[in-house]
Amino acid sequence: MSEQPFWQQKTLDEMTDAEWESLCDGCGQCCLHKLMDEDTDEIYFTNVACRQLNIKTCQCRNYERRFEYEPDCIKLTRENLPTFEWLPPTCAYRLLAEGKSLPAWHPLLTGSKAAMHGERISVRHIAVPESTVVDWQDHILNLPDRAR
């Protein structure tokens, strides 16, 4: 009988830093700029990528020093996770916090990011560089809800 994977054995609070980091599927959705409606506080995703996001790989160009380059970059931690209602419905942190399973395409289950990209969960097919954007409201989008 095989042992359950760590994300089924532990709560988010019990995970090591390495386990916590490995939950990230690398989709890049959290690296897209968001807009907030001033009247309703509703959050809208855009397809505008952070300047540090390599759109092709969906990875941060300067992950270890990202806060130096992007002061508005937000670090997701165990402590502040409950305040991030804007996380996409496919996000492993959000799913596990809500008591749900990882989706079948998640790299921890498949061993690679190919299935995630194939399901078009990553932003590589929709993101545009921040430097090319004139009117941010023209870039509001709806992200896929494929958390299965």
Swiss-Prot record:
Domain of life of the native organism: Bacteria
Family of the protein in this entry: Belongs to the UPF0260 family.
PANTHER family, per database record: UPF0260 PROTEIN YCGN (PTHR37421:SF1)
Protein name: UPF0260 protein KPK_1978
